[in-house]
């Protein structure tokens, strides 16, 4: 499978993923790009699961973003609804992690759109390892979101045999509002 991690902190939201594509117990490719910028660079998306399935869902999600003028939540709900009700899409096995300047979501084939606690997402075979590492770093360091994603992916790759050390990391910066 893979590992995808997303962290939001101090005016940055970051999604990173490894590059391993496996077929059974064989590594087929080590430098796949599983994290992408969508909607003119305003939305980040990462996927875990079957590569062909995930690319199909990514294309559908991008179409939903266009149809909903970049509204991440509406696009996510529309994709989840279509994914759940369309007979062909229901067979696709993948998870999407998506984020914009305001929100982050996990979209599943069961029709779930989940806004994670603490704006931390970790999916895929190494997701639990990456989530544990990222959570510890969020709670105990002042590292940037990008540094946390890099370290979480590295730790997951050291533990999970379906996660490698080739990382794609996308950073979306946004202004932070300081209370007066």
From Swiss-Prot:
It holds the Pfam family Proteasome. Gene3D superfamilies: Glutamine Phosphoribosylpyrophosphate, subunit 1, domain 1 (3.60.20.10). It comes from the Bacteria. InterPro entries: ATP-dep_Prtase_HsIV_su, Ntn_hydrolases_N, Proteasome_sua/b, Proteasome_suB-type. Belongs to the peptidase T1B family. HslV subfamily. This is ATP-dependent protease subunit HslV. PROSITE patterns: PROTEASOME_BETA_2. It is found in: Cytoplasm.
